[in-house]
């Protein structure tokens, strides 16, 4: 891989799935995905079988990072510091734990201290 590693927020993965050009430059690196994003992507109740198949193929090209005790602790710290949803705190904690950027189009992450954020 010639690119850099980063944690992909769920909306980044949706943009990849939809073929958005502005995310293509990121796809040369290692795409790390929190298990939370996997659940958010595949857990939508209106997801059709073909979409689910395509999303699974997309996720197969990513590294799924599980929720560890250290990430749980970081997510709790983040939630104690700022008002953010628990899934977003876990995704941010994954980025912080791995010490790699979080790529997202969600401005809510801007309030979280201690993470490197790349807004797309």
Write out the residue ranges for each language-model feature.
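Amphipathic alpha-helical segments within well-ordered protein domains
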Residues: 39-42, 56-59, 76
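Acidic, PIN/NYN-like endoribonuclease modules and their adjacent C-terminal/linker elements
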Residues: 1-2, 20, 92, 97-120
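A generic structural signal for short hydrophobic patches within well-formed alpha-helices
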Residues: 13, 38-41, 72, 109-110
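Active-site neighborhoods of divalent-metal-dependent phosphate/nucleic-acid chemistry enzymes
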Residues: 64-105
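Short, well-structured N-terminal submotif of metal-dependent ribonuclease cores
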Residues: 1-33, 43-56
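A general structural signal for well-ordered alpha-helical segments in protein cores
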Residues: 38, 52-55, 68, 72
């Amino acid at each position: 891989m010639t690119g850099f590693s980063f944690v992909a927020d769920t909306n980044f993965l949706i943009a990849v799935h939809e073929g958005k050009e502005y995310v293509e430059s990121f796809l040369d690196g290692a795409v790390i995905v929190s298990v939370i994003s996997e659940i958010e992507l595949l857990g939508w109740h209106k997801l059709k079988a073909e979409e689910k198949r395509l999303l699974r193929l997309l996720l197969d090209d990513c590294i799924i990072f599980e929720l560890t005790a250290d990430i749980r602790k970081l997510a709790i710290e983040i939630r104690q510091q700022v008002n953010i949803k628990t899934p977003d705190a876990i995704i941010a904690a994954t980025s912080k734990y791995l010490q790699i950027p979080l790529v997202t189009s969600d401005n809510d992450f801007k309030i979280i201290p201690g993470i490197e954020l790349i807004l797309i």
